[in-house]
Amino acid sequence: QPHPDEFVGLM
C-alpha cells in the first residue's frame, strides 16, 4: 500500500 507521502516525492 503506497503512502500518499511517497506520491508527493514523485511530484
From Swiss-Prot:
It comes from the Eukaryota. The keyword Secreted applies. GO terms for biological process: defense response; neuropeptide signaling pathway; tachykinin receptor signaling pathway. PROSITE patterns: TACHYKININ (PS00267). The keyword Cell membrane does not apply. GO terms for cellular component: extracellular region. It is found in: Secreted. The modification Pyrrolidone carboxylic acid is found at residue 1. Expressed by the skin glands. Keywords: Amidation, Amphibian defense peptide, Neuropeptide, Pyrrolidone carboxylic acid, Secreted. The modification Methionine amide is found at residue 11. Pfam families: Tachykinin (PF02202). Belongs to the tachykinin family. Tachykinins are active peptides which excite neurons, evoke behavioral responses, are potent vasodilators and secretagogues, and contract (directly or indirectly) many smooth muscles. This is Kassinin-like peptide K-I.
